[in-house]
Amino acid sequence: MRKYLTVAALGILLTGCGEKSDFEKAINEKISKNGVCYGFSKENNAKVVEDFRLGTPVRVNIYGRDDVDPVLIGLKNTGFLNISYEQEMFKRVAILETTDKGRNTKFWDSNNGACVGHRAVAEVKSWTEPSEGNGVKMTQVTYTWRLDGVPGWVDKKAFSGVKGMVEPEETKIVLVKTNNGWAAR
């Protein structure tokens, strides 16, 4: 009898682990697709990007209340960029210029800009019991993520303002059960 109870308990335990790893896989498929990057808007052409990489200053509009993206702050803190500001009528403009150190490091990718890694699940912390709703089976998962694939030129202390660089960030996501397993929506 003890043998059967031990096998049953082990089966239940392994089922929970399987679900947890399935959740992690589904979340990673969603959150790791795009890098954590700073780039120019799509209207800037290849010539502007190449000139910037060679040291020509580029003017970038700053929208909203935030002064500057945390990736830009990290690039400035590392000594790869000089950033100055001007006010133009009703908008603020940042003037970005690569330094000698920045040009030698080649931190800028012409397609994506400066990327400091991508999000990856650090830990699946908890989830709701999967339930039916609107004809689908779903669950809400609480997890932490951190930056993964961080390039060698990134000084984590200089980029500490970028979420997930130093400490994992906690968030929630809804997963839906499909014929191919769990998927993030």
Task: For the regions a language model picked out, list residue spans one by one.
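Sec-dependent signal peptide recognition
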Residues: 2-8
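Bacterial lipoprotein signal-peptidase II cleavage site
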Residues: 18-23
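Post-signal-peptide N-terminal segment of Sec-exported extracytoplasmic proteins
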Residues: 35-67
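Accessory beta->alpha helical hairpin/"wing" motif in late/C-terminal subdomains of nucleic-acid enzymes
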Residues: 78, 82-121, 128-130
